[in-house]
């Protein structure tokens, strides 16, 4: 027996109904903000991801040579692919460009709660605006996308890579990206291991204390931003803090400020982020951390050969979101069994059964027809097992009178219904 590949999953019908429900809630919200759907190839040239994705992501690539000897990889995220698409075809298009996607990604990492080697994300990319209004629009949509699924207990924590750059300069650190990678692991490592990582990086006791001070600057914007003003003194940092104040002001107008927190220790794992970054956290007992994140990446398009173009976006982690929604009972139970099961009694009734099933299907009624040649009793057993609501029994004697027998599988009640009236009867019967 061949097993499925480690870190991947098979989704059964019951699970697919739940996933589709979540996808549609999010898709609906994306489209109300004017975003349009795109989909890029599952494979890209490996160089695309090596340029600016970050050391950890590059290590996790599913990378290989194709039969032509070209280095290709399965996509680990969509932002790089969307940026490549923009550079290839849309540089002269009217701005801003507002695209969304719902797609699968691949990373070779150790499977754990909410983490798989194949996983799905739903995200948006807003290309062409460097304005704080674009950041606010994207973060507001990020919040509203979770709200659309019924989730209420979560926060969106906002940090800033420019402030982290300035912090590195304050410490005299030249390898700011290296420091950010360690800071990004602050919630993934025990504090002792985190401090040891900072020591190995080369920070002295004073530098480590400064880092610990920084990562504890988090909380409600009105409380935290004044603390940031005290910590940072450079003109660059002050300008960026003013941008954060402006962002929070706009998010209040979007009516999402209640979900917003500031966390200056957020770095995010991708090297392409340039300023504002953010991630969503929902309290849970499942061992799941961030359920999505994003930020501004103003240099990525230029790295891929395009003209300098600002951009921002986010991705929602579907594999992390769904278990939390399930644990909170937020995904409704959806009927996956057919509404109607048509059972012909005898060989001569098969075509009649097909015609009845066809008329019901054309009317939008989910209908299954008996295909296994079962006798009536076994057909009824099957109908009960799969949860069919109504069964139509097509018998020769009934047909002579132009009727069929409709059985309610829950109550056992039976009705004779004229074949010509069956569609209307079923529509009414299924409403109750």
From Swiss-Prot:
GO terms, molecular function: ATP binding; histidine-tRNA ligase activity
What EC number(s) are associated with this protein in UniProt?
6.1.1.21
Here the disulfide bonds are none
PROSITE patterns named in the record: AA_TRNA_LIGASE_II (PS50862)
Q: What compartments host this protein?
A: Cytoplasm
Gene3D superfamilies reported for this sequence: Anticodon-binding domain (3.40.50.800), Bira Bifunctional Protein, Domain 2 (3.30.930.10)
SUPFAM superfamilies per UniProt: Class II aaRS ABD-related, Class II aaRS and biotin synthetases
- Matching InterPro entries, A to Z? aa-tRNA-synth_II, aa-tRNA-synth_II/BPL/LPL, Anticodon-bd, Anticodon-bd_dom_sf, His-tRNA-ligase, HisRS-like_core, HisRS/HisZ, HisRS_anticodon
Reaction catalyzed: tRNA(His) + L-histidine + ATP = L-histidyl-tRNA(His) + AMP + diphosphate + H(+)
| Single Gene Ontology BP annotation | histidyl-tRNA aminoacylation
Cellular component GO terms held in the UniProt record: cytoplasm
Provide the alphabetized UniProt keywords.
Aminoacyl-tRNA synthetase, ATP-binding, Cytoplasm, Ligase, Nucleotide-binding, Protein biosynthesis
Reading the lineage from the top rank, the first entry is: Archaea
Q: Which family does it belong to?
A: Belongs to the class-II aminoacyl-tRNA synthetase family.
Record-given protein name = Histidine--tRNA ligase
Q: Which organism is it from?
A: Pyrococcus furiosus (strain ATCC 43587 / DSM 3638 / JCM 8422 / Vc1)
